[in-house]
C-alpha cells in the first residue's frame, strides 16, 4: 500500500494526425508540477495498441501484417480487445491502485469509432466485448482532439500509411463522424486540434484544471 489516493486515468482520442501523442507527452511533462497530482505519484505514458509486450506483438499484426495475413473486421476487433484486456490488467489497474496517473493514447472510444462506425460492426456487440476487456474500467477524463479529415490527410503528407490509415477516405470519414458522436454520448471534452500545438496544449491544461478543481496560476 502506498497511502496515496487512487490515481487518475486520462485518455486522448481522435483521428490519426490530430496530435494525440504530442499532446500526451506535453501533458505528462506538465502534470508533476501542475499541483493536480499528490506528492509521490508518478505519470505513466501508454498507448493502444502496444501498451504491453503482448500489445506490441498485436500492434504489428494489426497495423503491419505480413502479406496475405490481414485480419478480417471481426478478427481485428477481437485483437484490439485482447490488447486492451492485457493493457488494463497489467498496466492501468496496477498503476491506478498505486496512486499513479495513467495517460493513454487511445482507449475504448477508438474501437467504437474505427471498428464500429468505420468497419460497420454492431455497436452492441462492441460494447459487450469492451465490458469484458476492460472489466468496467472507464477513463476519469477523455480529451477528444477534433481535427477535420482534410487537415489530417495534409498533416500525414507522404508518410507511409499503416493498414488502418490505408483503408480509404470514406472509411476515415466514418471514423471521424463516429468520434463526434461518441464525444457527445460519452461527454468527452473537445479540443480544437486545428490550433498550433502550444495552443492545443494550453487548452488541455485548462480543461484539466477546470475539471479537477484547480485554478489556473
Regions found by a protein language model. Give the residues of each.
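P-loop (Walker A) phosphate-binding loop of NTP-binding proteins
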Residues: 15
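NTP-dependent small-molecule kinase module
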Residues: 2-4, 28-30, 150-217
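Pre-Walker A (Motif I) flank of P-loop NTPase domains
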Residues: 5-9
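Hydrophobic positions on the alpha1 helix immediately C-terminal to the Walker A/P-loop
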Residues: 23
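Conserved lysine of the Walker
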Residues: 20
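A glycine- and Lys/Arg-enriched "phosphate-lid" helix/loop adjacent to the NTP-binding pocket
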Residues: 106, 110-177
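ATP-dependent small-molecule kinase phosphotransfer cores
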Residues: 38-134
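Hydrophobic anchor at the beta1->P-loop junction of P-loop NTPases
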Residues: 12
